[in-house]
Amino acid sequence: MNTLIRMGISAAAAAMAAGALAAETNELEEAESSPLSVEVTVDFFSSYMWRGQICSDAPVWQPAATLGLDLGDFGALSANVWSSFKLTNRREGSPVRNMGNQEIDYTVSYAKSFGDFDIEAGHIWYTFPNVDDGESNEELYLSVAYNNPIVTPTAAVYWDYRDNDDDGLFYGNLALAHDFELCDSLTLTPSVSLGMGTDAYLRAYVDDVNKTAFLDQTTGLALAYAVTDWLSVGAQVNYTWIVDRDARRADYMGRDKNQRVWGGVNVAFSF
């Protein structure tokens, strides 16, 4: 206002300018406080690893989109769609290359914080477009994370409720991670995780293993850089190996494979 007056603008014009500025500010504040959010990510990995299994030995790119709704004190809802595409489908001894969609997953979830604890529950629908019989899987999951300055432990359990095995097809994961802020925009995150499957879970993926066992252990290092408030880029490297001897012998990870170094880069847009 002082600048406007010094420039000789009339009081009426100044008031109009102030009103317009206030309206614009209110719109910006309203936009910033909008309960809706959208995030789009694209990951590029050297291979597609899932719970210690090599789902693709070829490089993949994995786009995803998440719509979030902040419910304030009542928590938050989100809906996510994720997909994995092979960058190449070249087979040994064949010059043919093609790009193919391996998988499309749909997730709905609810999350709420209770003090230092973050609790999330959701449903995942796994679909495989290129599978002739149209096979799909569905899981319910629950995860609990404890936020603290030292290290953040997270425990998660997944239940394939459509499986016909009476024993229940469950997979669990325990993880530890910590964010180190190297500077205002750069974060380094080391992590370790350990997966466990019930005997029914193992029977669904490999033969001759009928027991509950620790399966996959992964040690990772991730680096994330916030380019702007809405754009970030990152990179990660991981080492995964199969813990249980019987699962190794049964080729749980893949044929004649019991360990893998893998990683990639990613970009994320938030609105």
Residue ranges and their predicted role:
Residues 28, 52-56, 89-99, 131-138, ...:
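Outer-membrane beta-barrel translocator domains and adjoining extracellular loop/strand segments
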Residues 137-218, 222-225:
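Detector for outer-membrane/organellar transmembrane beta-barrel domains
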Residues 1-37:
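Cleavable N-terminal export/targeting peptides
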Residues 36, 57-61, 100-104, 117, ...:
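Residues that define the transmembrane beta-barrel architecture of outer-membrane proteins
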Residues 225, 257-271:
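Outer-membrane beta-barrel "beta-signal"
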Residues 44-50, 81-89, 112-114, 125-129, ...:
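Transmembrane beta-strands of outer-membrane beta-barrel pores
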Residues 40-42, 65, 79-81, 108, ...:
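Membrane-embedded beta-strand positions of outer-membrane beta-barrel proteins
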Residues 72-79, 115-121, 149-155, 183-188, ...:
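Repeated loop/turn-to-beta-strand initiation elements of outer-membrane beta-barrel proteins
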